[in-house]
């Protein structure tokens, strides 16, 4: 997009502050009518069949002189054709490049005013009046920064049906691949951190297909065509998606967080795998790292709650597998996974006893299951799939497994032990790793032994009714039967 630079001869009157104007109250009919007259007069094209910068600044000034309620009333009185005319002119270079759109700072001031004043219905009307993708996103950023939570959630709900239309835009050389509405929604979702009610309302308005499209757009994939022919290149900037994940991490709702974690993980996997011979891509590593870091923070906010919700709602574990595979490739990634395993074993507060938690039954649907065992099975299955994806070989895998599980050979539960920190006997730990490294056991057998508490005899993993729940969690991800 090309924005017309300001000429030194052009009127550069400073816009009134968006917070100036009459005190809020009932809209004044006379001020609304006067502003409408000004706007319609300034949009009336003159001799050069164009609207000048001065005209557009007069419109801004007219809006700045109103209360929020009056601005909303003014916009509601403008027809769709009038809104289309106004938005077309905001970035119009005019006759011979002498007319005029507003510069980026002036547009930002306008979107600050509109975002903080209009209701969701009028904001959607202005948004849909734009043909220009960049200005759509600028307006959405104004909504994200300045609208009330009710307006933000209404705006998201209004755009939700449009997020799957795949209307990526661009020119011959550079094309934005994601849906504009999806990116707009991603920006607004990222502004809802700390507002549990707004997060719940916003995510409830998006089905999984729509949210996936929003998160895909939030990676800001851009295609660059090659004038000499051959394969195009791609770039990514996942800031909007990462911000949405960070905001979701502040919700107390484990199911909401699990949904965000799962769908963000799928997009991270797509970004991480995008750089290939046929699809050369720039910034995939940084973008994947940014998404992964957000997912880590979200997961750490309630490891047990999120994993339980994932096991119930996303049994294939695609998001968790992608997260763990990306984490294994990070410096210190094994340490991160170790901390997550410890919380799953001993509770989010690290004060529990792994064996007691693992074997604690819960009644459900007339039967009994073991939630801690099922969570550990699900996580362990995803960890196995992540190791398979990284594909480093037995020797290197053993060293990583030592880093992740070595701490679990601490104090084991038993009579008189009130501060047990471990769940693996040295014998079980050493046997699991040595048999895998020597080829006597498969990787999955080693991981199962390391994520199951040592039995009462101290020589072999636990064998009891909780195994059924562990196996269900494991097999839902790996499809590898343990019986």
Task: Tell me the role of every PLM-derived stretch.
Residues 1-11:
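N-terminal acidic, proline/glycine-rich, low-complexity intrinsically disordered segments
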Residues 11, 15-483:
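Non-catalytic all-alpha helical scaffold/repeat segments
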